[in-house]
Regions:
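Short, well-ordered alpha-helical microsegments
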Residues: 17, 81-83, 104-105, 155-156
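Conserved N-terminal alpha-helix of the aminotransferase class I/II PLP-enzyme fold
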Residues: 36-81, 88, 102, 110
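Short His-Asn-centered micro-motif
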Residues: 74-76, 97-101, 148-151
Length: 167
């Protein structure tokens, strides 16, 4: 199997080591000897609860998450996070976005449901070919937050600096 592996350097999923894939394949049929796949077990089962507890412990250890913080396992992916940002950060109802690619544009569109969103920059007319310099940004001083997508894998652009936003 390892001789004909394809190297995948695209955005998103990437190559995994063969031993990892083999363990996943075995667990897909019989997760750690439980007699069932993770896809088949109840989210209320002891085995599944063990998966969640082990995952949380690993996250806390690797990321140094203190005990006074909760670890949440939520569904939804990026689109849900695009809504969660304004739902949690908007205070006065104003936020600024730099539209530099697909994700930033989707985040901006979702955020518009929650308040007064302002495009502080857009490179859409040039097919998202660059991120702004500090001087190109039109950040409002009364915005609750300023949103950027730091790495635009579809268009191959990224920020090499953290924009100054004021207080």
């Amino acid at each position: 199997m390892a001789d004909n592996r394809i190297y995948n350097f695209s955005a998103g999923p990437s190559m995994l080591p063969v031993p990892v894939l083999e363990r996943c394949a075995a667990d897909m049929l019989n997760y750690q000897g439980s007699g069932m796949s993770v896809m088949e077990m109840s989210h209320r089962s002891k085995v599944y609860d063990g998966i969640i507890k082990e995952t949380e412990a690993t996250l806390r250890r690797v990321l140094s998450i203190p005990d006074n913080y909760k670890v949440l396992f939520l569904q939804g992916g990026a689109t849900t996070q695009f809504a969660a940002i304004p739902m949690n950060l908007l205070k006065t109802g104003k936020a600024d976005y730099a539209l530099t690619g697909s994700f930033a544009s989707k985040a901006y569109k979702e955020a518009q449901k929650f308040g007064d969103m302002h495009a502080a920059f857009s490179s859409k007319e040039t097919n998202f070919d660059h991120v702004p310099t500090q001087d190109e940004l039109d950040i409002r001083p009364d915005a609750d937050y300023f949103y950027i997508c730091a790495n635009n894998t579809i268009y191959g652009t990224k920020y090499n600096y953290v924009p100054e936003t004021g207080d």
